[in-house]
Amino acid sequence: MGSAAELTEPTTGTEKLHQPIEVEEDDEQIVDLERKTFRHGKGHDTSVDSSTITNTSSSSSSSFSGDGGTEETPDFHSNGDGEHTDLVNLEVPELETEIVFHQEHDDGKNCIVFFDGEQGSESAGAIPDAHEESQTADLNGEQTQLEPENGSTSEDNERSREIEEVLDGDVSKDLDAVDPLAGEVIEEEVDFEDVEYHDVENMMDKQETHDLYCPNCDSCITKKVILKRRKRKIRRHELGDSKRPHLTEPLFHSEDNLPSLDGGENSANESFVFKCLSCFTIFIPKGVSSKPIPPRQGVEGLKIQPNPQVEATGDSNWFSSIFGLNKKESAIQQGGASSSVLEANPPPRESIVPVVNPSRGNLSPMRKDTTGSAVVQPDAATSIQVAKSNDTSEIVNNGAIVGDGQKFLAPMVEEQTQQKIDNDDSSTADGNHTSDKGRLSPIQPSHGMSILNTVTNGPDGLKVETTIHEEGAPLLFEGKDTPDTSTADFGLTKVTGVMDTGDRGVITGPANPEIDISAGNLLEEGSLREPLMRRVVVQGRKLEILKSIVYGGLLEAITSLGVISSAAGSGASMLNILVLGLANLLGGLILIIHNLQELREEEPIRTTTEDNQTNGREEEEGRYKRLLGRRENFTLHATVAILSFIITGILPPVVYYFSFSEKHNKDYKVASVFGASLFCIVLLAIAKAHVRYPRGSYLKSILYYGSIAVSVSGISYVVGNFLEQLLEKHGWSDGSETPVGQMMLSSLMGRKAGFGYSSSY
């Protein structure tokens, strides 16, 4: 069929025969056999150049055998495109490349021709600086032997590797790896095309995966303003576990007492809230959202938070919750009181209002009707926090109005109030927003602020009148002359929602929703004291001194004026009036000391919870604190009150004795005493209005105490004058300055009254 040719490579002086290569005639043509050498380098792509490839035009097999007949081939890996990648870091000395063409001539004879790979020309003689090769071509099909000219070809024989690649058509097969030289370390590198390398650490530091968007104005609020709220300290032995309220007895509590959203990792962020500078809406961080929430028309500052223990689901059993079968009723957590809410029956809603859901991790929308009433998901406990800026608007929160300059979040309410609400799908909360004035901002609690709810049951239903009060503090709402009161008319079957509009005054929400209140849970008639989240009120010594002056001097000034007026009207002498005034002062001094001691020993009134646990001294109320101040300053209070009592008590008799002393005109003396005493009473009335809480009107206080002084002085003078005339008419007085008592005593001893004047008749 064909002829066979044997190849002999140069060795160390000996010739080794190789297996003949079987070549079929007219079917196989060896096109190229290229052997290239490469230098050892890392990272250099020599995968293609590090192999010896034999390509055939048809399916055939060819083999090359090395020393000793052992075949050693490198491990090739295909990259999927028919190309092979070889090991790169094989350290092979630089050798010259020879290209061998084995071609069958037309005359049927085989020949082998060697080419220099670098020069690209046929090598017929000696190779420069390397070795000389002798080439013998056997045209008759016999063996061809190559003899080296020198011994330098031994290194080429040791470090060269022969690679066999068998191609079956166009499909390549995996080859075995070439054994490396002893002591060499091979590093494998696979070069992939179109691969970009990046600094992962810098990318992770710079990237921002999520942003927090305001649902109202669609602005990023992640890097806006972060407000930190102060924790409210609550004694656990008094209020129990504030983080796990009982479902049967839910309690209002402040947002500061809510548990952390994600456990211990987010406990540090529990006291932070996010405020958008565009629309001034405050949000509680609860997670991130992959998409920004579109702006919606909703209530600013209305935060509805579901109870972490009861998840809000749309498949909740509302039928069992209405009839009391479901024991896990939703609890409104706010302050220290709660309202157990069932569900009302509103029509389907279309618009969406974003709701902060701390148990989920993102801002969840809720449905809202076109009238503004926000619909909460069923079985969700709601907590509404309202606050405002320093404008003249008022805020109604749990029946309490907070007016000018007052800002607060959810108040601490310690009276538990239960309201049953008929609701088909969800409980409703009024959420209209009509102005841009009412903004959320936290305040610091005070120590003496409380609200007074007066509940009356009239023909029109249950009516609650709420009054804000803070003991021992100046006027809480600057610019107001009367205490802030509001009346929430619960009616017989419904409660109208109350909201903050930012304008002065209180507006009630629409008639939707209607809240039915069961008769068993209505409050009885009476008054309930509910402490509000307190504003910090600093009561210094000046305020307490002013209170002590008012306490000791106001009533004594009125009393002393009445005594002097009565004595002057009865026609007593100046000396007798002075002595009478001083005697009255000494008797009153003993009484005021007794009153101060009794006031100090009086037990204070403390606000208690349902568990009969006191809330501590900061919620102490009593007459002493309201009239004088702190009990630890009793010595100061008593001293100032006694001095004020003496000064105001001695003023009328001294003025009466020393005024108009030359003329001895009784009417002028009475007028001077009345003017001096009235001036003193007016000053004390102004001070009384200043130290009163809530601060009253100065004009009303002046008119009130001034009218009392005028009436006391006038009535005393008239009564004294009338008694004098009555005694003279009945002969119990001879017109002298002898007291009436002495004349009556003489008559009892057997002497006739007016005996010395019998001769005149």
Swiss-Prot record:
InterPro entries attached to this UniProt entry: ER_body_metal_sequester
Biased composition (Polar residues): 136-154, 416-432
Topology versus the membrane: Multi-pass membrane protein
Biased composition, class Acidic residues, residue ranges: 22-31
Extent of Basic and acidic residues compositional bias: 74-85
Amino acid composition bias (Low complexity), ranges on this chain: 48-65
Coiled coil ranges: 186-206
Main location: endoplasmic reticulum
Superkingdom assignment: Eukaryota
Subcellular location: Endoplasmic reticulum membrane
TM stretches of this protein: 549-569, 573-593, 640-660, 670-690, 702-722
Induction profile: Not induced by NAI1.
Cystine pairings recorded for this chain: none
GO cellular component: endoplasmic reticulum membrane; plasma membrane
Keywords: Coiled coil, Endoplasmic reticulum, Membrane, Transmembrane, Transmembrane helix
Residue span of region Disordered: 1-85, 120-162, 338-374, 416-448
Function field: Not essential for the accumulation of ER body components, including PYK10.
Record-stated family: Belongs to the CCC1 family.
Name of the protein this chain belongs to: Membrane protein of ER body-like protein
Gene behind this protein: MEBL
